[in-house]
Amino acid sequence: MDVFVLDTSVFTNPEIYRTFEEDQRGAMETFIHLALNSRAEFYMPTSVYTEMRKIMDVGELWAEFEMVVKIRSPRRFQLTVPADFLYEFIEELRYRINKGLRIAEEHTREASGCEDVGKLIARLREKYREALRQGILDSKEDVDVLLLAYELDGVLVSADEGLRTWADKIGIKLIDPKNFKNILESLVRHRF
């Protein structure tokens, strides 16, 4: 049986949810219908589900969503992750922190002759955020999705490039989230 671990991006990223329907509510309804008629299992970490409920308002659909998606946290205290994963993650963090410092230094030098400090700060924030957050695990929710997919040997469904990059490093199966609806439709057609 196929096991899919879902990230919020399936339902909040317009590029992804529009593969199901034009709006988030319709996308969730279509997902629920397909999920109910497939033989697959679907999981989402509790922290991710909580985050998604704050972002989306789909009313009574939450009950149906919980009927098809098992909401649970990874067993963090029982999981063993490869030491190389942690080593590489720390190395990546150090690289990004140093890159962020260089960006801050560059903008500090520019500030001496700058008339519009507000624009400079906005540019600094943008570049700093890009240097430190893009392409990396940057939240506990990301780590929960990664660990749950690892624990269940599930297929990760996410548009988050950082999450996908790190999942691939530890051997988690991935699908292109833009293909998720077609995969579900195929599972429904071939379920017997």
From Swiss-Prot:
Among InterPro entries, the record links this protein to: PIN-like_dom_sf (IPR029060), RNA_free_RNase_P (IPR014856)
Q: Which GO terms describe its biological process?
A: tRNA 5'-leader removal
**EC annotation from Swiss-Prot or TrEMBL:** 3.1.26.5
* Enzyme class name: hydrolase
Q: One MF term in GO for this entry?
A: ribonuclease P activity
Q: How does it assemble?
A: Probably forms homotrimers.
What does the sequence similarity comment in the record state about its family? Belongs to the HARP family.
> Which protein is depicted?
RNA-free ribonuclease P
The species this protein was found in: Aquifex aeolicus (strain VF5)
